[in-house]
Design a protein with these regions (language model features):
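Conserved, structured core segments of small domains
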Residues: 1-99
Length: 99
């Protein structure tokens, strides 16, 4: 099942020094790229302000926890299960047969 992960930077844990912030952001970007290259992360995006974004994965709960734990405490996450269009149609068809 597809999972939508929305995230928001927690600036209270960001380094005060701009050079250190850039270094931390680069580390996070490298982790994202690693997830994309491995296929675990299907899609990722960040707003132009750099403070929030999204990720899409089909990993299970344990894989997702292992992935997002790398960013804590600098990033806050919300994870939601999503249905594909095929899953929605199949569910609706099953409901139609019952009723």
């Amino acid at each position: 099942m597809i999972k939508l992960i929305t995230w928001e930077m927690d600036r209270s844990h960001a380094p005060a020094d701009p050079a250190e912030r850039i270094k931390l952001t680069m580390k996070h970007c490298e982790l994202v790229k690693k997830g994309m290259d491995s296929g675990k992360t299907k899609m990722w995006g960040m707003n132009p302000g750099g403070n929030h974004g999204f990720s899409i994965t089909d990993g299970d709960e344990k894989e997702i926890f292992a992935m997002i734990a790398q960013y804590i405490p600098h990033v806050k996450f919300k994870v939601e299960s999503m249905l594909s269009i095929d899953e929605v149609i199949a569910t609706l068809k099953a409901m139609m047969k019952q009723g």
